[in-house]
Each structure stands twice: as C-alpha cells, then as structure tokens.
From Swiss-Prot:
InterPro entries associated with the record: Ribosome_recyc_fac, Ribosome_recyc_fac_dom, RRF_sf
Presence of keyword Protein biosynthesis: yes
Name of this chain's protein: Ribosome-recycling factor
Similarity annotation: Belongs to the RRF family.
Record key words, sorted: Cytoplasm, Protein biosynthesis
Name of the gene: frr
Physiological role: Responsible for the release of ribosomes from messenger RNA at the termination of protein biosynthesis. May increase the efficiency of translation by recycling ribosomes from one round of translation to another.
Gene3D superfamilies: 3.30.1360.40, Ribosome-recycling factor
GO molecular function list: ribosomal large subunit binding
Cell membrane found in the keyword field: no
C-alpha cells in the first residue's frame, strides 16, 4: 500500500463519516417540516416492513406540515399508525386519503435538549474522523518500519492526513452550528 493510497482511503472514509453525520442530523426534528424526517419510518406492507417512501408520496404542505399520500387507499390507516408509532412525537391526521403530519412547535427546553443532542452527534462524528487519522498514521508508521518509505515521507504524509482531519472536523463544526441555528429559530 502506498502513501497516496492511504491518503485517498482516509479521505474517502472521512467523507463517508460526514455523510453519515448528515443523515443523523436529518433525523433530528426541528420546528420546520421536511420529508427526510419520515425516511426511516417503516410501514407494514402486506406482511413485510418497507420504508414509507415505497408506499406513499411525501410532500410539504407548508412550512410546518408534511403531506403523506399512500398509493393504495387500504394503506392509509397502516401508514398513519406507522408514523404515530415511529417515536417522533408526531400526531398525524387523516383527511380522506391524505395524511397530514403537523410539526408541533418546540418548547424552549426541548430546543436546548436537541442542541445538546446535536453537539453530542457532532462529537461522535469528530471522534470517528480522528480515529481514521490514527489508523492512517499507524499505516504510515508500518510503511516506515517495513522500510517502504522514509521518515521524512511519513512526516509529510502525516501532515497531509492532519490537514484532511482538520478540514473534516471544521466541516462537522459548521454542520453542528447550522443545525443548532435551525433548532433555535422559532
């Protein structure tokens, strides 16, 4: 394995960590409605559990309401039940074959709790990125030990890995700040 392979691999893994972090952030409910909030809701579709997006059309009715339109009329009750039981604190209301999911306004206390959750998720993501840096540095040390690269090359590559780490940690910080601002906006 070459130095370039190590750097390329660690950058890809760090990018995947950022993507996973973004997905985690998308699941955290803010006062504003977005269809991504229901992405992980599973619906019982003729005996098998499937994502809600495979049995219904999700749209934004307004800034605080998600519209869920099941493709089959007989699925309306099951979809509503799945949303209610998804532990998101949502209370869907059915009007014909359209399910409206209003976003309740967040209390100040709940907003503060959510910002703590966001910070915690951010720290977890940073730890993942730093662990990737550690793994890359260990691989570089192994190359030096096996006399495949010089110590100078290892130091340069280590600096490059540190720059990648700093870049990704800064991106995580930026995502945390924007999510906190979104949560605290009334």
């Amino acid at each position: 394995m070459s130095v370039a392979d190590i750097k390329k691999g660690v950058e890809q893994k760090m990018q995947r960590s950022i993507e996973a972090f973004k997905n985690d952030l998308a699941k955290i409910r803010t006062g504003r409605a977005h269809t991504g909030l229901l992405d992980h809701v599973q619906v019982d579709y003729y005996g098998s559990m499937v994502p809600i997006s495979q049995v219904a059309n999700l749209t934004l009715v307004d800034a605080r309401t998600i519209g869920v339109q099941p493709w089959e009329k007989n699925m309306v009750a099951k979809v509503e039940k799945a949303i209610r039981e998804a532990d998101l604190g949502l209370n869907p209301a059915t009007a014909g074959d359209l399910i409206r999911v209003p976003m309740p306004a967040l209390t100040e206390e709940r907003r503060r709790e959510l910002t703590k959750v966001v910070k915690g998720e951010g720290e977890t993501a940073k730890v993942a990125v730093r662990n990737l840096r550690r793994d890359a540095n260990e691989q570089l040390k192994k190359l030096v030990k096996d006399k495949e690269i010089s110590e100078d090359d290892e130091r340069r590559a280590g600096d490059d890995v540190q720059k990648l780490t700093d870049k990704h940690v800064a991106e995580i910080d930026k995502l945390v700040q924007s999510k906190e601002a979104e949560i605290m906006t009334v």
